[in-house]
Regions:
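Predominantly extracellular/luminal regions of secreted and cell-surface proteins
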Residues: 28-49, 141-144
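Acidic, Ser/Thr/Pro-rich low-complexity intrinsically disordered segments
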Residues: 1-24, 54-139
Length: 144
């Protein structure tokens, strides 16, 4: 697909999904145009009932804890990821790079803990490389 769409005047909602970008594009076409610029409103992918996800660089992944307490967010990879944790409004709570933990031999993985509130949304995002991200309610370093 070449990325071009020819539209007659009207209002359109297009869904975009691909490597590194997902979201909904809303655009109003009022006359014949040669170019159209639309913002992509990124949405988050839910962890659902799982405690791990393969996280692509730049994507948001939403986690909603079932109980209040300390949660541990960490990567297991062969790459060099950096982890970001955001609150329900996507305000940055913390970012971590190169933090060792017992579940990986890669010293470039990340590991962070945060006191989360039950029922609230938390967003995880990675940069550097796509990785497996895990969320646990017990310290993975204490599990061994």
């Amino acid at each position: 697909w070449n990325g071009y769409v020819y539209l007659v005047p009207g209002t359109y909602e297009l869904t975009a999904e691909g490597s590194g970008k997902r979201g909904v594009i809303s655009a109003k076409v009022t006359s014949k145009t040669t170019t159209l610029t639309a913002d992509v409103n990124e949405f988050a992918i839910d962890f659902g009932n799982f405690n791990d996800v393969y996280a692509e660089v730049g994507m948001y992944y939403r986690y909603v804890p079932k109980k209040t307490g300390t949660y541990y967010f960490y990567s297991v990879s062969y790459g060099d990821p950096k982890g970001y944790l955001y609150d329900e409004n996507k305000n940055l709570l913390m970012e971590v790079d190169d933090a060792e933990h017992s579940k990986t031999t890669n010293k470039k993985d990340f590991y962070m803990s945060y006191n989360c509130e039950a029922g609230k949304s938390y967003y995880i995002k990675v940069s550097g490389s796509s990785v497996d991200v895990y969320v646990r309610d017990c310290d993975p370093n204490a599990e061994d």
